[in-house]
A protein has these predicted regions:
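Short, surface-exposed ligand- or partner-binding patches at beta-edge/loop junctions that are enriched
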Residues: 72
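Rhodanese-like catalytic fold shared by cysteine-dependent sulfurtransferases
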Residues: 1-24, 32-68, 77-116
Length: 116
């Protein structure tokens, strides 16, 4: 049986950022044009889904293997697919997917982020 991405909602991720635990690495897989519309106020890595190759992602993740990783997009589909791809290609053993993406983050945590 294969592995699947873990799910985390906006409220739980916000609690994590505000806890004593080390912050997770937030990865946004939306395209650059989407970042220009709505951007996380938290620090994040940008890996546009259109640029994903095994070598590119493996190189970026090489320095993150001791960190928890949370992936996001606009609503959840691309981030889930990217997370599953990372697991299927043995790039990571565990990865989190933000339920409802930046849209959920805007609705529940930071209404200053535009919704689109």
């Amino acid at each position: 049986m294969g592995s699947y991405p873990k799910s985390i909602n906006a409220s739980s991720l916000n609690d994590w950022f505000n806890s004593e635990k080390e912050d997770p690495v937030l990865i946004d897989v939306r395209e650059q044009s989407e970042l220009e519309i709505a951007r996380f106020s938290k620090e994040f890595l940008h890996i546009p889904i259109s640029k994903v190759t095994f070598e590119y992602v493996e190189e970026i993740f090489a320095g993150l293997l001791d960190r928890e990783i949370v992936v996001t997009c606009h609503a959840v589909i691309r981030s889930y697919n990217f997370s599953q791809w990372c697991l299927d290609n043995n790039i990571v053993r565990e990865i989190w997917n933000l339920e409802e993406g930046i849209d959920g983050w805007s609705r529940y945590i930071d209404p200053s982020i535009p919704r689109y």
